[in-house]
A protein has these predicted regions:
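Flexible, gly/pro- and Lys/Arg-enriched active-site loops
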Residues: 3-5, 10-173, 179
């Protein structure tokens, strides 16, 4: 069995915003393509609100939804009630697990993951949901790709600059255990 590789995947505005009223405050088709390319064929783990914002399971991936609502059901998805259950269940089936939101799952897993895939949006946005602050000195930036949106997705209808950034946890910083 291959070791499980646990990663966070998020799009984050310059001011830390990741959402507003349970939606993304921007529209970046290239970021959605990037998300799909990274996660296709793997397991994605999300909270119930993230699932609700998407509105369906994402095809070509094992969708795991973490919720405290014991009566929650989602067609074609695996529903669990703790993060530990999600990691235990999927850890036996897939060598790459992606935490895709929301804020609470990001907070719970930031100390556990080995890799961060961040789309860093080079602009502030109004929002009510934020990515947790993390100590960048615990991470090594392994890649950065600069992009500018084609459309009118930024403030005042201007193109939006964003970067696809990958961070790996430094070897001297051990991920935390779940127990």
């Amino acid at each position: 069995m291959k070791p499980v590789h646990l990663s966070i995947l998020a799009a984050v505005a310059r001011n830390g915003v990741i959402g507003r009223h349970n939606t993304l405050p921007w529209h970046l088709p290239e970021d959605l393509k990037h998300f799909k390319a990274l996660t296709m064929g793997h397991t994605i783990i999300m909270g119930r609100k993230t699932y609700a914002s998407i509105g369906r399971v994402l095809p070509g991936r094992t969708n795991v939804i973490v919720t405290r609502q014991l009566d929650f059901h989602a067609p074609d998805a695996i529903v669990v009630h703790t993060l530990e259950d999600a990691l235990h269940l999927q850890g036996r089936q897939d060598d790459a697990l992606f935490i895709i939101g929301g804020a609470r799952l990001y907070e719970q897993t930031l100390g556990l993951v080995q890799r961060l895939y961040l789309t860093e949006i080079q602009q502030d946005f109004d929002g009510d949901t934020f990515f947790p602050v993390f100590d960048r000195s615990d991470w090594i930036e392994v890649s950065r790709e600069r992009h500018v949106s084609d459309g009118q997705t930024g403030m005042a209808g201007m193109p939006l600059e964003y970067h696809f950034v990958v961070f790996d946890r430094k070897q001297t910083v051990e991920p935390k255990n779940l127990s």
